[in-house]
């Protein structure tokens, strides 16, 4: 299913580029846009993880300089039957975490310094189990490509604005200019919808996977509660909207108002905690 989602995202990206390229530059623009889209798809598949890690200044660590963290990841990976991923720490005081990579053999998990300082060992294990569940379900490739795609859509919106402006200046393509302006306005919404489509359900799925992997859903439950309380006071300083869906909680804080809730990339933390409580009851009744 995740492979299908990944292919779908790549096709959508290509079609968007070709469509906008055709309006801006005709047949030649379509060809150029097609080649650019091919290049971006190739880049997204092989390098999206590196781009995201670099975006957040993540530093790779080993068992020598992060013994406790490394040991938790190794133990969970073995229990999940996964290859050992690379482990990164992000120099950021806001607590958060994400996983990235194109498959379990090329995966990485990253946590912020703030998360390590805020949570106890059991809670950290719950968070890392959540991230490794993303790895096991192949969510990481889809999420990484979606992050690059959201950035590409933002770039396309700028191209569309340029096309609208140039068309209106020539006074010969007013219809095309109007269409391009509409595209420029709806593309940011399209990027958000794409992030929503791949994020909400997979967070519940990863929460459940973490609960089953550790056997202690209360660990992740406690971690999410702390993360939400802290994130509403301290949001990530260099967080990017294009990659917000990758984190275990929204790096911009939990959204409360009704309108914004419709476009949130994460389920509400209270709903996630409620689901974890249900899983906990099911485990006790076995």
Swiss-Prot record:
- Which EC number(s) does the record attach to this protein? 3.4.24.-
Q: Where along the chain is Zn(2+) bound?
A: 130, 134, 203
Its membrane topology, per UniProt?
Answer: Multi-pass membrane protein
State the active site. Answer: 131
Q: Where in the cell is it found?
A: Cell inner membrane
What InterPro entries does this protein's entry cite? HtpX_protease, Pept_M48_protease_HtpX, Peptidase_M48
Broad class of where this protein is predominantly found: membrane
Q: Any one Gene Ontology biological process term?
A: proteolysis
MF-aspect GO terms: metalloendopeptidase activity; zinc ion binding
Cofactor(s) essential for the protein? Zn(2+)
Q: Quote the cellular component terms of the Gene Ontology held in the record.
A: plasma membrane
* The record's free-text note on cofactor binding: Binds 1 zinc ion per subunit.
Q: Which residues cross the membrane?
A: 6-26, 28-48, 140-160, 178-198
The EC class name is: hydrolase
Q: Which UniProt keywords apply?
A: Cell inner membrane, Cell membrane, Hydrolase, Membrane, Metal-binding, Metalloprotease, Protease, Transmembrane, Transmembrane helix, Zinc
Name any one Pfam family assigned in the record: Peptidase_M48
Question: NCBIfam families, per this entry?
Answer: PRK03001.1
Family (UniProt) = Belongs to the peptidase M48B family.
Q: Please identify the protein, giving its name as recorded.
A: Protease HtpX homolog
Ranked from the top, the taxonomy reads: Bacteria, Pseudomonadati, Campylobacterota, Epsilonproteobacteria, Campylobacterales
């Amino acid at each position: 299913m995740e492979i299908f989602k990944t292919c779908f995202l790549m096709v959508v990206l290509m079609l968007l580029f070709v469509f906008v390229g055709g309006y801006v530059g005709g047949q030649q623009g379509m060809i150029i846009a097609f080649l650019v889209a091919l290049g971006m798809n190739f880049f997204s598949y092989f390098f999206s993880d590196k781009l995201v890690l670099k975006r957040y200044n993540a530093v790779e660590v080993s068992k020598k300089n992060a013994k406790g963290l490394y040991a938790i990841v190794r133990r969970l990976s073995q229990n999940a039957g996964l290859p050992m991923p690379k482990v990164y720490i992000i120099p950021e005081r806001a607590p958060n975490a994400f996983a990235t990579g194109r498959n379990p053999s090329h995966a990485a998990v990253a946590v912020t310094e703030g998360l390590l300082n805020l949570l106890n060992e059991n809670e950290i294990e719950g968070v890392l189990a959540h991230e490794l569940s993303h790895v096991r379900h192949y969510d990481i490739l889809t999420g990484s490509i979606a992050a690059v795609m959201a950035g590409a859509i933002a770039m396309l919106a700028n191209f569309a604005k340029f096309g609208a402006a140039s068309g209106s200046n020539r006074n010969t393509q007013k219809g095309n200019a109007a269409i391009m302006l509409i595209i420029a306005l709806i593309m940011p919404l399209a990027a958000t919808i794409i992030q929503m489509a791949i994020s909400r359900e997979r967070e519940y799925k990863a929460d459940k996977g973490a609960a089953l992997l550790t056997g202690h859903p209360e660990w992740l439950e406690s971690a999410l509660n702390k993360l939400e309380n802290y994130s509403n006071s301290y949001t990530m300083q260099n967080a990017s909207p294009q990659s917000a869906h990758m984190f275990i909680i929204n790096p911009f804080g939990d959204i409360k108002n009704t309108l914004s809730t419709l476009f949130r990339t994460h389920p509400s933390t209270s709903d996630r905690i409620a689901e974890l409580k249900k899983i906990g009851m099911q485990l006790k009744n076995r």
